[in-house]
Amino acid sequence: MGTVILHSVVSVDGFIADDKGDVGPLHEWYFSGDVPILPGSGSGSGGAEGDEPFDHSGSGGGIRVSRASADYVRSTWDSIGAIVMGRNLFDQVNGWEGKPPAGEHVVVVSHRPKPDGWHPEASYHFVDDVTEAIDTARALAGDGTVAVNAGDVGGQIFAAGLVDEVAMDVVPVVFGSGRRYFGGVDGQHLLEDPHVVIQGERVLHLRFRVRR
């Protein structure tokens, strides 16, 4: 089965959003470069063939990263078979309207079911347990990567020992408070030295294997 990777864009002081859930300048690097990245253009594409991709930029400009980040972002997204997310993020982005940025499948950790009539064609699966979420995502992803969105749910999955790697796109900004990358994790966990270190423009891409 594929690798389970905890991932998010993060401030240098460890926050993925402010107290209200706003990402502020964290995602600016996604939309300020010269190289277009089409969500769902890899080995697993969200939505049916011929569908218009969901506009993750929110402005119609699409995702455009620097050349330094482009190869890393493409290879990362191309490897993803399934995404695991919490209900808060699902509600915030309305599940990307059934068209995730990468992979073909999404598992949502929630005590509430999928909304009635919501994009019945989309491969979105609602479960109420983090272990079940990873088991479901791995089965759906096959040999592909399982990408877990960081935050409260991601922190629970990490604390349960279900994460193989930690991936951070570190942006040079200090939030001071907000929603933490690792959620409520309060114990010590050792990681290996980073095996990926890529300096982009206004972002540093890092990946660490979890020490077992």
Model features per residue range: what roles?
Residues 1-160, 172-212:
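Portal/gating segments that form or line small-molecule/metal binding sites
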Residues 162-164:
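Short acidic amphipathic segments
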